[in-house]
Amino acid sequence: MKYRDLRDFIHGLEQRGELRRVTQPVSPVLEMTELCDRVLRAGGPALLFDAPAGHRFPVLGNLFGTPRRVALGMGVDADDEAALASLRDIGRLLSALKEPDPPKRLKDAGKLLSLAKAVWDMGPKTVSAPPCQEIVWEGDDVDLHKLPIQTCWPGDAGPLLTWGLTVTRGPNKTRQNLGIYRQQLIGRNKLIMRWLAHRGGALDFREFALKHPGQPYPVAVVLGADPATMLGAVTPVPDSLSEYQFAGLLRGARTELAKCVTPGVDALQVPARAEIVLEGFIHPQQGAPAPAPEGAPPRPAAGAAAGYEHALEGPYGDHTGYYNEQEWFPVFTVERITMRRDAIYHSTYTGKPPDEPAVLGVALNEVFVPLLQKQFAEITDFYLPPEGCSYRMAIVQMKKSYAGHAKRVMFGVWSFLRQFMYTKFIVVVDEDVNVRDWKEVIWAITTRVDPARDTVLVENTPIDYLDFASPVAGLGSKMGLDATNKWPGETQREWGRPIEMDAAVKARVDRLWTEIGLS
């Protein structure tokens, strides 16, 4: 089943019993978080709050709260286990797009041409009179407080926009970038754009500030896009392919786009059937900035981007299960808000796993496996345990071929995808260890690891800014554990031989099992 827009997806989920409408008044301040958190932990449905307290816009929460709903959003209709297997097919598609195999036969060349044609055919198309612009707020009508923006946790600094797809373009790029960055509400038309330095939006902004210093930087934020576009924004799409094209491949139909209506932002294109779109700019700082609060970190001082309006963001509860520190980020000033009639506001929360990002991580884990295997054929499985805050720990299963092989794989994973830049811990195991079973992983660590020989420590590496355990914000260490069987050259001792029951005895006990009445 392919979904043209969010409403189509909501209808499909409701038909499958995967969405529940909440008609009772529920407050966006804390109550929605608590309700969504309980439902997600129970493996329950997406929630559509028809009557959010104090607001007229319905709120959609817990949309991707199970792997099955993630797969449904990518066009795969199956239960959780089958859905995860199907997501590997999407990973194989991405792998082929990222690095196509040279054709060995005429048949292979035909497949490669078919794939290239499919990508070409799924280029987005621009439409006129798009649904996302049925209603336009401008001037004094622009008031973000009218939207039911959630305050997720008691210690949060204020309401937080969480599921916005931020659309940017760098001055030297033809393709647009889609990224999901949380945004703190600080005024009727102002949000703090929390994009980390390595993310696409931040890179586009810095390049623009260098090339056009003192000029406003155009930005659009999309709320309530179709599921394929939302998931395309969190998938490791090759740089040669736009997220809109990839969404078209998932959907089986070209992504319909609309030009933004605000002068200066109209070079950006947004999904034509999105629920709500915020259009505006990051403006240069006018005059001297207000003094920083006592004890606050210093304002950005280096680089062209430092000359733009910034504000102190946070603290907010995050996917680590803790409140993060305050930091300075650019201020996004909203000039216009466009929307569909009867628009739906899409939201989420982040907290100690499991949360929605953790579920997305479980699903995207299956997409990562073929990508890794394309680069490292020795990798036989890969797992990002959700308890590891989506990406901070990885368990790698491999077919080991020589001494030192596991360490090569560690460094390969750390450097392969941007998503693994912040992975703090990597454990490498042999093929006989199930990476999804902590009991087996712990057994491998405790029986196959010598702490001095098999631990790799790397200092002064990029680390998530939210990781307060690192000694310096954004810079910390990484640790790899080689929990594989050791080869000659790695040990001078005779390696242990695993205990295994005689096959004939196992077969006899299989026959006795039913006779004894144990089945």
From Swiss-Prot:
Pfam families for this protein: UbiD (PF01977), UbiD_C (PF20696), UbiD_N (PF20695)
Subcellular localization: Cell membrane
Cofactor: prenylated FMN; Mn(2+)
Main location (coarse class): membrane
InterPro entries named in the record: UbiD (IPR002830), UbiD-like_C (IPR049381), UbiD-like_N (IPR049383), UbiD_bacteria (IPR023677), UbiD_Rift_dom (IPR048304)
Keywords: Cell membrane, Decarboxylase, Flavoprotein, FMN, Lyase, Manganese, Membrane, Metal-binding, Ubiquinone biosynthesis
UniProt-annotated binding residues for Mn(2+): N177, E243
Residue positions of the active site: D318
Pathway: Cofactor biosynthesis; ubiquinone biosynthesis
Binding residues for prenylated FMN: I180, Y181, R182, R194, W195, L196, R199, G200
Coiled coil: none
Reactions the enzyme catalyzes: a 4-hydroxy-3-(all-trans-polyprenyl)benzoate + H(+) = a 2-(all-trans-polyprenyl)phenol + CO2
Gene3D superfamilies (UniProt xref): Single helix bin, UbiD C-terminal domain-like
A GO term for molecular function: metal ion binding
Quaternary state and interactors: Homohexamer.
Protein family membership: Belongs to the UbiD family.
Function field: Catalyzes the decarboxylation of 3-octaprenyl-4-hydroxy benzoate to 2-octaprenylphenol, an intermediate step in ubiquinone biosynthesis.
Record's protein name: 3-octaprenyl-4-hydroxybenzoate carboxy-lyase
Source organism of the structure: Burkholderia mallei (strain ATCC 23344)
Gene behind the chain: ubiD
